[in-house]
């Protein structure tokens, strides 16, 4: 196998595992509990534009390397992705980042939504955006913990 074929094969393997993670996220019953709508939108904002899902893929590959059925590792893989995502949401707040992967950060998106209502001044809109961002991360953290607690 050539180096290019190996790289293509690896990227295809990553796509497959990313699909497993995304399919699980779409079907998990817990997402119906994420209310109000702003929290739901915040929880899924980074997950919709996620990268290669490397961390969960490492878990899948490790499972397969020791003879396990990779797809059975999906709840743990999803928990890893959620855990990583909530730390990014909180990191963006701490660093006061306004963009992530070319899109607005969670807290910036909700700051802007608050301003767009015409009911918030700059200070209150900023507070609202940060509050939704923190709650978004906390919901993702709880979701990850819930998935891990069901593994045994």
Each language-model region and where it sits:
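N-terminal amphipathic/basic leader segments beginning at the initiator methionine
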Residues: 1-29
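Mg2+-dependent prenyl diphosphate-binding active-site environment of isoprenoid biosynthetic enzymes
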Residues: 29, 33-152
């Amino acid at each position: 196998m050539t180096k290019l074929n190996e790289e293509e094969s690896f990227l295809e393997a990553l796509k497959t595992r990313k699909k497993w993670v995304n399919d699980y996220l779409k079907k998990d019953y817990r997402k119906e509990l994420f209310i109000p709508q702003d929290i739901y939108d915040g929880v899924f904002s980074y997950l919709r534009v996620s990268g290669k899902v490397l961390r969960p893929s490492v878990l899948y590959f490790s499972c397969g390397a020791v003879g396990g059925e990779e797809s059975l590792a999906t709840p743990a893989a999803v928990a890893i992705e959620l855990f990583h995502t909530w730390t990014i949401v909180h990191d963006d707040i701490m660093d006061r980042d306004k963009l992530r992967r070319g899109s607005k950060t969670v807290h910036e998106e909700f700051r802007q939504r608050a301003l767009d209502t015409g009911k918030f001044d700059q200070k209150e809109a900023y507070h609202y955006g940060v509050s939704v961002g923190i709650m978004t991360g906390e919901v993702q953290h709880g979701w990850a913990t819930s998935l891990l607690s069901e593994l045994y």
